[in-house]
Amino acid sequence: MTTFLAGGTGTPKLLAGARRVFDPAETTVVGNTGDDVALGGLLVCPDLDTVLFEGGGVLDRETWWGIADDGSTTHDYLTDLAAAADIDPDTPRYLPDDAQTAGRDIARWRRFSAASEFMFIGDRDRAVHTLRAGLLDEGHTLTEVTRRLADAFDLSVDLVPMSNDPVATIVQTPDGEQHFQTFWVAEHGDPTVEDVEFRGGERATAAQPAIEAIRDGPVVVGPSNPVTSIGPMLALDGIADALRDAQVVAVSPFVEDEVFSGPAAKLMAAVGHDPSTAGVADAYDFADAFVLDTADSTDLDRPVVRTDTSLDTEADAERVARACRDALVAASGEVT
């Protein structure tokens, strides 16, 4: 059994080549749900969906978001209709506080009006969110729904969410708080970040399949954003402890102090970690070994395997996955 902690695009890119290194039938992927949004009643789970679509062979690999060649009929008409009604279609309309804790529990603190569809949702992509919302409304847990969707996409790995409870990543800025999707999609990551909150994390329970998969490890933490992709998982009671009991290798999303992509540097600094590979190692005190880029000379107190950590192709991903396997061997002290 091998377990991957997945969020954003870093770990899904790694998974694209990992299937040649780690047996998919013996692989579990635990997906971050802190980025999820309820948009017009639909539950959008970006990090789960990227794994679903990649494993199902339909992912838009240009954006690593949504379904390739998806239609935009509903999104376009909704945008035009909103504009005609004098509604700015690009400005998120976060629902009032009392609405954030009403209705479906899993959507707490992440509810947006569909009057402004600030995130592009394709027609087939929308069907996935519609089915997910419908099954949740029937009383199924997010774990159950995710596994049914994984079956529908014929995934070869077991995909489970980190929790069946709501945890929302909230970014604190000088102008007030924003859901992470407002910060990243609508504001393009421009606002100054003062802190990051994982709202609901102190009350949420980690999904049992996620805990079991981590305990059964070893665990691979891909080059995802340590704050917004992995942080929500660490906020859950039980996951950090399970990681400390497991054998864990982490791939740094930095080359020394240069991040590969995304807002990780800004967010790391905001939560008190140095935006660098050294800062990632401090944040991941549970990790037994690291995979670093060959250009990264950071000296760590744990075993390190170096390789080219770029993930532009499946061959790249396979190379990094093999480095992860080598790092796990190094951490265990086994001789190969």
UniProtKB/Swiss-Prot annotation:
EC category name: transferase
Reactions catalysed: (2S)-lactyl-2-diphospho-5'-guanosine + 7,8-didemethyl-8-hydroxy-5-deazariboflavin = oxidized coenzyme F420-0 + GMP + H(+)
UniProt xrefs under SUPFAM superfamilies: CofD-like
Keyword terms: Magnesium, Transferase
Cofactors named for this entry: Mg(2+)
EC number: 2.7.8.28
UniProt GO MF annotations: LPPG:FO 2-phospho-L-lactate transferase activity; magnesium ion binding
Listed GO biological process terms: F420-0 metabolic process
Pathway as given in its UniProt record: Cofactor biosynthesis; coenzyme F420 biosynthesis
One Pfam family per UniProt: CofD
Entry-linked Gene3D superfamilies: CofD-like domain (1.10.8.240), CofD-like domains (3.40.50.10680)
Disulfide bond entries: none
Alphabetized InterPro entries for the sequence: CofD, CofD-like_dom_sf, FbiA/CofD
Binding site for 7,8-didemethyl-8-hydroxy-5-deazariboflavin: 49
Function summary: Catalyzes the transfer of the 2-phospholactate moiety from (2S)-lactyl-2-diphospho-5'-guanosine to 7,8-didemethyl-8-hydroxy-5-deazariboflavin (FO) with the formation of oxidized coenzyme F420-0 and GMP.
Family the entry assigns: Belongs to the CofD family.
Record text on subunit structure and interactions: Homodimer.
Protein's UniProt name: 2-phospho-L-lactate transferase
Lineage summary: Archaea, Methanobacteriati, Methanobacteriota, Stenosarchaea group, Halobacteria
